[in-house]
């Protein structure tokens, strides 16, 4: 009898436990599903934020591109104005030399005038000492014949005419001197006015360039902040994706546990019916035994790892002095014959027609000498080539960079003696002086040696 009671009690406990297990599993699954929905909602919001941030960055990049175009135009005008100032200062210097030459000529003219004045004074004094016009009359009356009289009259007339010519020539020299001085003063006034106008224009352009550069920096700061926020949003999206995947795995495990519990319940109910049937059909007092067993499942998780990537920068380009001279010779061969083209030199057609911008010109010149600096090179990539050297140690063949419309916005090949070979928007391919006010202001000591 006790065995029957025990069997019935055990079956009751197992049955009750199996009733509660699916309920508990269903509750847990509902909570997990709710968490998954919340994460999906949050991930949707983050993705929306990512899309919005991408549009913001695209807009900032478009504004930056337009601004760079405006800065390029201002920079071109500033360079042209600087070149005009340089030319006008040369003209001013030449005019000053003309002034010195004219002063010398003036002194010589004054000396001739003084000498002529002395001759006239001496002649007048001689006339006065010898009776003046009476002396001329005595000369005429002393003639021995009519022919002699004519000869003496002609001589007297010649002397008088000579004095008159001296006076006329002296007057002409004075007029010439005054005219030369007047022309010179007019020319100097025009030069000074033009120089003043050019310097005012240059100052205004520099001011505009500074304002645009500040605006460019502000846009760059905004873009950097937006990109940082975008990076954070992407990280958050990645984290939410992992959480969602973990919850999905948890849901699978909970559903598997619920299925196992339901199966256990079914097996328990079947066992209980079997025990009850055996007890009813046995009248001999024999007791049937029942035992149960439970299987526990195990779950395993796999960890995945992603390989890390290592990026390396370009190495120093090295060659020999022959490559430097070959590059300079090639570049110099088109001085004055190659117009500047923004973004040029990056197609075979441009190269064949010698249409470059500053960076593609430098790349082309060195490529012709067997030194490859990278097809499609820009000032941003070239400034990372070779190794940095100080401005005091730069030598022929080094790359020199200038802060024009942006930091390191222009590049050329240093030739030595303060000159460099470059392709600029004002003169195309040309040799320019680093002492030119424009280039002097733009050069901040950035020099790269690409050929040792």
Curated annotation (Swiss-Prot):
Keywords: Cell wall biogenesis/degradation, Hydrolase, Protease, Secreted, Signal, Thiol protease. It comes from the Bacteria. Residues 28-38 have a biased composition (Polar residues). GO terms for biological process: cell wall organization; proteolysis. Residues 1-30 form the signal peptide. Residues 276-317 have a biased composition (Low complexity). Residues 321-450 form the NlpC/P60 domain. GO terms for molecular function: cysteine-type peptidase activity. It is found in: Secreted. Coiled coil: none annotated. InterPro entries: NLP_P60_dom, Papain-like_cys_pep_sf, Peptidase_C40. One of its GO terms (cellular component) is extracellular region. Residues 28-53, 258-317 are annotated as: Disordered. PROSITE patterns: NLPC_P60. Residues 39-53, 263-275 have a biased composition (Basic and acidic residues). The active site is at 358 (nucleophile), 410 (proton acceptor), 422. Shows a cell wall hydrolytic DL-endopeptidase activity. Belongs to the peptidase C40 family. This is Peptidoglycan DL-endopeptidase CwlO. It comes from Bacillus licheniformis (strain ATCC 14580 / DSM 13 / JCM 2505 / CCUG 7422 / NBRC 12200 / NCIMB 9375 / NCTC 10341 / NRRL NRS-1264 / Gibson 46).
């Amino acid at each position: 009898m006790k065995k029957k009671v025990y069997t019935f009690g055990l079956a009751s406990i197992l049955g009750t436990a199996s009733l509660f297990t699916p309920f508990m599993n269903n509750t847990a699954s509902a909570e997990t599903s709710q968490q998954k929905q919340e994460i999906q909602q949050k991930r949707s919001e983050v993705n929306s934020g990512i899309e919005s941030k991408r549009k913001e960055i695209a807009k900032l990049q478009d504004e930056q591109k337009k601004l760079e175009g405006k800065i390029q135009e201002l920079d071109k005008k500033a360079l042209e104005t600087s070149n005009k100032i340089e030319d006008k200062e040369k003209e001013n210097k030449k005019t000053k030399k003309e002034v010195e030459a004219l002063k010398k000529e003036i002194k010589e003219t004054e000396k001739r005038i003084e000498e002529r004045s002395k001759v006239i004074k001496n002649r007048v004094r001689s006339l006065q000492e010898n009776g003046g016009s009476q002396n001329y009359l005595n000369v005429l009356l002393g003639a021995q014949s009519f022919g002699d009289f004519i000869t003496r009259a002609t001589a007297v007339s010649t002397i008088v005419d000579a004095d008159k010519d001296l006076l006329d020539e002296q007057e002409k020299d004075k007029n010439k001197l005054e005219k030369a001085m007047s022309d010179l003063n007019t020319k100097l006034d025009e030069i000074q006015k033009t120089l003043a106008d050019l310097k005012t224009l240059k100052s205004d352009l520099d001011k505009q360039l500074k304002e645009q550069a500040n605006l460019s920096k502000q846009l760059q700061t905004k873009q950097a902040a937006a990109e940082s926020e975008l990076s954070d949003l992407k990280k958050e999206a990645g984290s939410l994706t992992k959480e969602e995947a973990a919850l999905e795995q948890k849901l699978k495990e909970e559903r598997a546990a619920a299925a196992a519990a339901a199966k256990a319940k079914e097996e328990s109910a079947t066992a209980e019916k079997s025990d009850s049937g055996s007890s009813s059909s046995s009248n001999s007092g024999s007791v049937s035994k029942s035992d149960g067993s439970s299987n526990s499942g195990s779950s395993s998780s796999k960890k995945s790892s992603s390989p890390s990537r290592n990026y390396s920068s370009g190495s120093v380009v090295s060659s020999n002095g022959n490559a430097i001279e070959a590059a300079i010779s090639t570049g110099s061969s088109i001085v004055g014959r190659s117009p500047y083209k923004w973004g040029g030199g990056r197609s075979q057609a441009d190269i064949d027609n010698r249409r470059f911008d500053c960076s593609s010109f430098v790349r082309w010149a060195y490529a012709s000498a067997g030194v490859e600096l990278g097809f499609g090179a820009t000032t941003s990539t070239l400034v990372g080539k070779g190794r940095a050297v100080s401005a005091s140690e730069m030598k022929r063949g080094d790359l020199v960079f200038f802060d024009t419309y942006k930091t390191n916005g222009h590049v050329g090949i240093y030739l030595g003696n303060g000159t460099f070979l470059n392709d600029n928007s004002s003169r195309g391919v040309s040799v320019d002086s680093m002492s030119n006010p424009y280039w002097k202001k733009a050069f901040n000591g950035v020099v790269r040696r690409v050929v040792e």
